[in-house]
Amino acid sequence: MLTIYAVSDSIGETAEQVSKATARQFKERVDVKRVTYIRTFEAVDDFINSIKDPENSMLISTVVLVDIREFLVERCIERGIRIVNVLGPCISTASRVLKTTPTYEPGAVWNMDDRYYKKIEAMEFAMRYDDSKDYNGIKHADVILIGLSRTSKTPLCMYLANKGIKALNVPIMPEIPIPEELFEVDRTKLVGLTIDPIRLIEIRKHRMNKFNQLSSEIQYANGERVLEELEYADKIMRRLRCKIIDVTNRAIEDTALLIMEAIGYNGFRES
């Protein structure tokens, strides 16, 4: 089940209507919850911290207050929550056509510099190719993360996107061949993610318990299966001769820093 949070710094009607229109496109259950008058950093923190299932949640935001909007995006990235700003592209396009700067409440002027657009482009890229079987993005990525399920690939891609880095992730499973495209790209763009087997089992068991998947995915957290996956992933990473980073008990920010160092990132990514 997906929960869409319609977030606004006003009454939230627009965000809710867009959220409901989105939900109606799917047969699966999608809940829509309106979150209104998000106008302070404290309100953002309280709201984001209240989300119990980040992986199965997304935000559709119409927040226009710049500081609050930026902070909301940062907090979403920290928790691996996907966010879509509805008004941003509309206002930006109108502004370019009118050749003028849009105004909001005092001090709330939309940041339309080159870095902002690169960040948005990178975030859209990360969401488009997240755990995807569409590998067309590999040749356009600044970094390609490869690793087993539950090695933080998605939140890392979103965090890197906030730095303007186009990050794509490729899941590794013994039953599924890795794409040949990985052998054709500059290997300095490849980063393998590994993890301690005991920690990986804990993470997977926690996920299974949360979604009551003990019967259908019993092998997912089985010790022998996890060791088999890790051994297979290690062989793949060595074949690719890529940088390998251990994410065990490491914060997203710390792992992202190591990734940025590995690819030679020393500032906002330029095209």
Swiss-Prot record:
Name the domain of life this protein comes from: Bacteria
Q: Which InterPro entries match?
A: Kinase-pyrophosphorylase, PPDK_reg
Pfam families the UniProt entry points to: Kinase-PPPase
Task: Using the UniProt record, name the top-level EC class of this enzyme in a single word.
Answer: transferase
- One GO MF term, please? ADP binding
> Which Enzyme Commission numbers does its entry carry?
2.7.11.32, 2.7.4.27
Please list the residues that bind ADP. Answer: 147-154
Keywords for the protein's UniProt record, in alphabetical order: Kinase, Nucleotide-binding, Serine/threonine-protein kinase, Transferase
Q: Reaction catalysed?
A: N(tele)-phospho-L-histidyl/L-threonyl-[pyruvate, phosphate dikinase] + ADP = N(tele)-phospho-L-histidyl/O-phospho-L-threonyl-[pyruvate, phosphate dikinase] + AMP + H(+); N(tele)-phospho-L-histidyl/O-phospho-L-threonyl-[pyruvate, phosphate dikinase] + phosphate + H(+) = N(tele)-phospho-L-histidyl/L-threonyl-[pyruvate, phosphate dikinase] + diphosphate
What residue stretch is flagged as signal peptide? none
What does this protein's UniProt record list under function?
Bifunctional serine/threonine kinase and phosphorylase involved in the regulation of the pyruvate, phosphate dikinase (PPDK) by catalyzing its phosphorylation/dephosphorylation.
The record's comment on protein family reads: Belongs to the pyruvate, phosphate/water dikinase regulatory protein family. PDRP subfamily.
Q: What's the protein here called?
A: Putative pyruvate, phosphate dikinase regulatory protein
The species this protein belongs to is Clostridium tetani (strain Massachusetts / E88)
